[in-house]
Amino acid sequence: MERRTVLITGCSQGGIGSALAEAFHQRGFHVFATARKTEKMTHLRDLDWMTLIPLDVTQESQISAAVELIQKHTGGTLDYLVNNAGDGYIIPVLDCDQVHGRQIFEVNFWGPLRMIQEFSPLLIAARGTIVNINSVASETLPLWLGIYSSSKAALLALSETLRLELKPFGVQVLSVMTGAVQTMIFQTNYRLPPDSAYVAWEKQIAAQAEGSEQASRMSATVYAERVVGDILNRRGGITYRGQMASFAYWVVALMPRFLRDLVTVKMAGIS
């Protein structure tokens, strides 16, 4: 029986992509795991049917090289594309460095779009599935995450449009709205710009950047197992996974905006 194939971006050790790569591998897939530097995926190197590819989603030449490599492996098809690579940016909007902000959009929005466009012939040939790993922040809009949340909200709008545009070709599109997940990808020694108007709340902002403000997080392994289950069930549209993800859905769906504002401000620790 021919193995199904999946390409996953952002598979550095300790992150969601790595856990997804292992979960797909356990299901018998040929996994094409990517990261900017392959040395960050050495924990996956010795697994059978695990192909490691250096790939920066902001570099079109690297994406084209990955397409060519996978075409040679599969004969021109790809069953699943998982756009997981992403960068965070925790900063008050007034303090945002615009060059850095544009780079966040390059990785979180334009990167997935580049991947989808380049791999679309392979996905259409396989009647495959595109999975965009998103964040509940794109809907709950927490403080200090304005740039990051905006990039993920743009990705959600793109995904939902693509979901309908690709229906005639039998290609599914799934957005995974991710809650709190235990990973190793947090900032350390966070500091605001010295002239920031928000220095009085630097401690609270730093706690969020360093991942210490929320003790309860779903393990990346459990998260990945559930997400892979959603993907293999051919469930297009939107799914919510990770700690507090379902709660976030109901808050956005049912809570009046003024109450959401109160909760958001309280959770940020400001008055």
Swiss-Prot record:
GO annotation, cellular component aspect: endoplasmic reticulum; lipid droplet
Record has Oxidoreductase as a keyword: yes
Family: Belongs to the short-chain dehydrogenases/reductases (SDR) family.
GO molecular function: acylglycerone-phosphate reductase (NADP+) activity; triacylglycerol lipase activity
Entry protein name: Short-chain dehydrogenase ptmH
Active-site residues (renumbered): 148 (proton acceptor), 152 (lowers pka of active site tyr)
Domain of life: Eukaryota
Keywords: NADP, Oxidoreductase
PROSITE patterns: ADH_SHORT
Organism, as annotated: Penicillium ochrochloron
SUPFAM superfamilies (UniProt xref): NAD(P)-binding Rossmann-fold domains
Residues reported in the UniProt entry to bind NADP(+): 8, 34, 40, 56, 84, 148, 152, 181, 183
The keyword tRNA-binding is assigned to this record: no
Protein's job: Short-chain dehydrogenase; part of the gene cluster that mediates the biosynthesis of the indole diterpenes penitrems. The geranylgeranyl diphosphate (GGPP) synthase ptmG catalyzes the first step in penitrem biosynthesis via conversion of farnesyl pyrophosphate and isopentyl pyrophosphate into geranylgeranyl pyrophosphate (GGPP). Condensation of indole-3-glycerol phosphate with GGPP by the prenyl transferase ptmC then forms 3-geranylgeranylindole (3-GGI).
Protein's pathway: Secondary metabolite biosynthesis
Transmembrane segments: none
GO terms of biological process kind: phosphatidic acid biosynthetic process; secondary metabolite biosynthetic process; triglyceride catabolic process
EC number: 1.1.1.-
